[in-house]
């Protein structure tokens, strides 16, 4: 597939089709949604895809992606380097043409790229058009070339800035704030895509670095699509150890596929064309399903497996518990839309059919133990499908499936247009009663749910239908259930709002409902129909004022606002008040939160001392000793002992030993911690506090004067004064609110807060549901331990 990779890739290879004018007017057509973050991350993917195309052509094996502290992103590869010669038609460097002209690129010239991820000549010029600035550094022909663009226009022509024996291209860009509502990148979203690319392109080392918090991950993932399947199944229980793998080429097209069954009831298939994911599958997936059904059925019939089990197997049975990655590569792929979510190239079908048929037949014949396990799983699925069919008929007769008889517990709304209707799923009859009284019955329906609904992660379909609460929910929604029956067009409400108590039981019920929607009605999540209500956690009374506060953070911020009213600190003749006092107080409270979270890993006394110390440097023994001396000087010798430890390969640590209640507590300050966002917060706070408040300082709050020899003392006094005469009530349940309060805080569209449920990484989401709701205890315990620090509002 890369037989033409040695063809000349120069200025003559770049073809120009049209200009950039339309991009800035309608960026969504080219890059996706510019407000929800998807378009922003797609900017990185466009540049990254260019580097991957160099790897596909056999010219690149190292790619580095960096999120910089100024929110710019750079993508560097060690490929051939963009062409730097003068373009014959445009009269300027080919690199400038690629960056400034839409549809200019080597992807339209089959000599330069035989296979590429669609028409990516669009990509990098669109990134340039939608960025405040772009810098392009090219290492080619023993020289380093540089050019800078501002809002899509060349600042000055490409120039040689020095000699270099490197080769490759580095693109760095700052996304335009006029186009994008938010330019905050998610490390996890970028990591998900890079992980896919690493599995799909053996031999390419991709590194992702986040300079904002020092996070770094290297993706040199081996195993190809088989390794990808193993990764997807790592939190599940595979039924057979050996992974099915197939690879074949024909007529310039290639098919690569890996499959492994696990003990779950869900199918998990990832499809790719030229490294681009297809969320909606397409001709390659259709062909795979057909050939898989035909081949496995032939094996089952030949070995009389179904006959002995007295069941008839179908295609759906074969996909229950299947984890599969299918990757096809072909020239000029055709998709159903600009988003490339569905492949429509018909020519790939016969190739998939031929490759999989032979490989799967051989796999089943040569691995009888695996074949027995897989066919046994399929027979079990067929039996369950038959039981589910009978259960479905019973429930249909009861009116559950078709929604003819609405449940008596449902307080429906008057509105008949689903787009204008809301359904609140409320925990308990008490809160349900308050919600029914407080709602706007014109468009708000209420369905109280009694107790905890069935955990569908562990239950087969027929058991789920037998659950009264689940059956009631299915009936109320009106869209049916199951592959044959579910129809989202029949859904009676386009806003389904989960409203539970702010305690552990409420969180559990919310998780059970999310599991139900994710596993049984994922399209409702994809369409953005599922929401989580945000009832307030606190009600504060201060004099005649009454205020509802969403969570701990909002409570602290509100208290801080009251504390700082008419407050000032006078130290060494300098007055600290207004915005300066407020900013410093917020920074200090943030540091306190960090100390609380990080004290699990680093001694709390030492973390507090860091607020009064210089930044710690462990790059040399001398600097590490200085840090030990300074921190020790801020602590009582009886409290903690610090010492420098020399580790492997020049790594240094500071060991902290402290006695507490007769126990010896040991923790470490490591380089990883010093590169974290948490430590950045502590050093920023230390810088803000340095020399701010000294001995003899005075705090004034209104008419009152207090002694305050540190900022922490002053803030403690202010917060204590603010809470005098105030009562703060913590709501444990929705039933504690009367109907008017529930409407005012949680149901009134003018003031309420709703969280929309979205899935950004399907594989990660699948893992979370398997971990939290599955049968395995150890992964769940590990998950809870690892995430305990970031959990909020957990009952003591």
From Swiss-Prot:
The record marks 452, 455 as: Interaction with DNA. Residues 421-536 form the Toprim domain. Mg(2+) 1 binds at residues 427, 501. GO terms for molecular function: ATP binding; DNA binding; DNA topoisomerase type II (double strand cut, ATP-hydrolyzing) activity; metal ion binding. Its EC number is 5.6.2.2. Its cofactor is Mg(2+); Mn(2+); Ca(2+). One of its GO terms (biological process) is DNA-templated DNA replication. Mg(2+) 2 binds at residues 501, 503. It is found in: Cytoplasm. It catalyses: ATP-dependent breakage, passage and rejoining of double-stranded DNA. A type II topoisomerase that negatively supercoils closed circular double-stranded (ds) DNA in an ATP-dependent manner to modulate DNA topology and maintain chromosomes in an underwound state. Negative supercoiling favors strand separation, and DNA replication, transcription, recombination and repair, all of which involve strand separation. Also able to catalyze the interconversion of other topological isomers of dsDNA rings, including catenanes and knotted rings. Type II topoisomerases break and join 2 DNA strands simultaneously in an ATP-dependent manner. Heterotetramer, composed of two GyrA and two GyrB chains. In the heterotetramer, GyrA contains the active site tyrosine that forms a transient covalent intermediate with DNA, while GyrB binds cofactors and catalyzes ATP hydrolysis. Belongs to the type II topoisomerase GyrB family. This is DNA gyrase subunit B. The lineage of its organism: Bacteria, Pseudomonadati, Pseudomonadota, Betaproteobacteria, Neisseriales.
